[in-house]
Amino acid sequence: MTPSPSNHDPVRAIKSAALHPRTTRNWISQFKLAQGTLIPWLASRGVSCAGASVAEIGCAEGGVLMACVEAGASYALGTDIQGQLLREVTTNCASIAGYSVDLTEHDVIYEDIPDHWQGRFDLVMLRDVIEHLDDTSIALRNIKRLLKPGGVLLLTFPPYTSPYGGHQQLLDTRIAKLPFIHMLPRAIFQKFINKTTTVNKEEVERLAVIRLSADRVRTAAVEEGYAILDQRYFALRPVFRWKYNRPWIPTLEITSLSRLRIVRALAMEAAFLLRVPS
């Protein structure tokens, strides 16, 4: 794959298409997050998308993955457990934006890694996905099989103990929108969950069991043979300005304070670059 012509404007193409407003918002926020934050971060650590084979697990609308193609990725694979989303939304977005990507329904924990994926990728991305997975260690172990020697995993997620780490904002009650309400005693929080009818109810309950932390990810990564190339922590996430279409929202990084456990626990985003041995 080669970068798009200089007059190519994928964001304008997506905005102009007859897409659901949520699809438009999500794709653009993903694309701009990758261009404005993720790809520059990778470059600062010597990881380039140019000529690279890239995979994104849990790619959703595919904006991040397609930004990697725009940056020169030679091959791009997007997977998600929601096959209907890939078929009806992501494929359409790729066509409208003018990118060639492979899209496949796949579960990184419960399904085998196809032979032709193993050892193929220079970069794998797992953005806001790992907190939903039942076993962090198995996920990291399986992803390691995708990577070439010296390959890098980019991983971001909101720790459970962060203000909205319980994803309680997905529930359809006003009180559930409050920060830290998921940190109430489980029996009390469960009462709020039980009052909702949202399809996200079961996922909020699952997250309350998983309760993923940055420290658990760090420990699992080292145990699975990764080296921590870099780690960052944010009190205000880089994606907010694009996700909510509020350019004035700052990105507030608190990595300089991350030696303190409470900072790692309360950060709204933990982000890691993990490298497998060469």
What are the language-model segments listed below?
Residues 1-119, 123, 140, 236, ...:
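Conserved N-terminal segment of class I S-adenosyl-L-methionine
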Residues 21, 134-142, 152-275:
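S-adenosyl-L-methionine-dependent methyltransferase catalytic module, highlighting the catalytic core
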Residues 108-110, 131, 162:
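Active-site micro-motifs of SAM-dependent methyltransferase domains
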Residues 126-129:
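A short beta-strand submotif of the Rossmann-like class I SAM-dependent methyltransferase core
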